[in-house]
Each structure stands twice: as C-alpha cells, then as structure tokens.
C-alpha cells in the first residue's frame, strides 16, 4: 500500500489520523474532520466569503427560540446524518418535535426559496492544478438524490460563481482528490453553498458515461500522483438513482446503446436505499 483514500466521510478522525501515520491518507484527515461537522463546515465557507444560508449552533430548545429569525428552517445534527437522516423541519418555535435529542448538537439553517439545486465536482491535483466538471443539475425526492443531468439549466453568472467557489474551497483546503460542492439557487438567482462532500459524489456518477475521464478515474489519478488528463465532456447525460424496489424492473430490462445500467449488487433491498443507477447519454 502506497496511499490510502476513502469514499465515505463519516469515518472517525482518530482512525484516519492513525492510518496517516502509517501511509499517506488523501484527502487529509484534518479536511474530513472539518467537513464532518456541519457547523465548522459552514464557518469555513463563510470565512472564505462563500455565501451560505443563515445558520446558528443549537444546543437546546431555548437556542431555537432565541434564533427565531431562522424559522422556518431546517434543524440538522452537526455530525452524521445522511440522505435526510437526523433532520427536522422547524415551522414555529411552539412546534418543536419531541423526537429531537438535545444530547446532540445541531445546526439550524434558515430555508431559502429554492428554485434549483446544482453540484460542482472538482479534482485537485496539487497547487492550482484542477480538472473541473461543469455544474450538474439535481432533483431530490424525500431528501434523497433522484435525478441528475448535465448540463445544468442555469445562468452563466451562476455557472461561473459555482465553479469559482469550488476552486477556492479545494485550494483553501489544500485538497488532493475529487470533491463535490452542493449548491442551492433561490428564486432571485442567488447562489448558496449547501455542503462539501470530500469524495466522489452520487451526482457525478453520470461522468462515467458523459466524459472521457470520470470523477472516479480523476480521483485515483490525483491521490496516486498520476498524470493529469484534460477532462472533456463527450455527451450530455441524465442519471436516475434506483432506490429500493426501483432496481427490480431494471434488472430485467433491455437497454438501448445510449443507456447504461449500474447494479450495486447490494444483498438486501430496503426502502430509501440506493441500489443502483441508470444513465442516458445524448448522442
């Protein structure tokens, strides 16, 4: 083993730090520690002049009432939680769920009037050396990514801003490998950084078929110190996540030459579990 990498951010920092004493871990363990906590992640973004929704650290019910200017908003656990887990909608200070466990720390984020969600995937190979994929447009259902498409239907201003912010993030983190920045666009065409994923990302799975170099190959090239290949889009593409029982129809389907089915071969089908994905390219 020459280098260690990972594709799941909820790995305890102590484990990554210990591994890093044996062989280099990329992305660096300190980056993952920063991003694992939604509050420190938001602070990092704001310190770098990257707009986020308004937010506050919440330790108890009184903190929610003090921050009533953030309501309506979304209460999220500061750590863990994935695909909408550990999240609570707060509409009124009098309507706080009894399911909230205040032995944990939370972040309360004010809702924006959402028009669209996009993501930008970037691979950093070292100081100011990048390969950047154009923004991908995403649609979530029940807080789980359902559809992605490239190109995103967005203004040139938003495209440039989203790409620029992703570059700043990768550079300020001294990141090596592929990362994704997820964004909100509001009804006034303002861009907000929602979160950073320090890994290859679900929305970027379509790059396997849409580009000459996928997000996965670029990640491996970066962490292994291999040659950087100029990344080009070959086809526009749309991707559908296959969640739960959706996978069963696709396992028996016949596909056209511009359709690609990926079965993750998970042993158990469960509700809200990502079982595979399906990509269509526009030839």
Language-model features, listed with the residues they occupy:
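Internal nucleotide-binding/catalytic subdomain
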Residues: 86-181, 185-187
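Protein kinase-like catalytic core scaffold
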Residues: 131, 191-195
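Acidic/histidine-enriched active-site and ligand-binding environments that engage anionic O-linkages
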Residues: 66-75
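Active-site "cap" helix and flanking loop/linker of ATP-utilizing ligase/carboxylase catalytic domains
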Residues: 160-181, 187, 197-245
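Peripheral (often C-terminal) accessory segments that flank ATP-dependent C-N-forming ligase machineries
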Residues: 221-283
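Short, conserved charged micro-motifs
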Residues: 63-66, 95-98, 247-252, 283
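Conserved N-proximal alpha/beta basic substrate-recognition cap immediately N-terminal to
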Residues: 1-63, 80-81
């Amino acid at each position: 083993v020459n280098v260690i990498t990972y594709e799941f951010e909820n790995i305890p920092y102590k484990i990554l730090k210990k591994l890093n004493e044996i062989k280099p871990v990329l992305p660096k363990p300190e980056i993952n520690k920063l991003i694992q906590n939604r509050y420190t992640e938001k602070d990092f973004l704001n310190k770098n002049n990257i707009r986020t929704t308004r937010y506050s650290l919440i330790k108890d019910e009184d903190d929610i009432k003090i921050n009533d200017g953030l309501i309506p908003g979304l209460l999220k656990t500061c750590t863990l939680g994935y695909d909408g887990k550990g999240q609570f909608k707060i509409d009124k200070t009098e309507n706080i769920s009894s399911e909230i466990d205040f032995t944990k720390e939370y972040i309360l984020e004010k809702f924006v009037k959402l028009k669209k969600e996009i993501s930008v995937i970037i691979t950093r190979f070292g100081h100011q050396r990048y390969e950047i994929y154009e923004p991908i447009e995403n649609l979530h259902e029940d807080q789980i990514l359902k559809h992605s498409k490239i190109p995103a239907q967005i203004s040139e201003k938003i495209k440039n801003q989203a790409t620029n912010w992703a570059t700043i993030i990768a550079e300020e983190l001294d990141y090596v490998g592929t990362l994704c920045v997820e964004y909100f666009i509001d009804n006034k065409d303002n861009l907000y950084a929602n979160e950073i994923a320090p890994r290859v990302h679900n929305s970027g799975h379509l790059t396997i078929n849409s580009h000459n170099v996928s997000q996965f190959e670029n990640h491996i090239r970066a962490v292994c110190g291999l040659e950087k290949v100029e990344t080009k889009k070959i086809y526009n593409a749309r991707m559908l996540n296959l969640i739960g029982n959706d996978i069963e129809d696709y396992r028996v389907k016949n596909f056209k030459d511009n359709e690609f089915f990926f079965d993750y071969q998970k042993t158990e089908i469960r509700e809200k579990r990502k079982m595979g994905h399906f990509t269509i390219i526009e030839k």
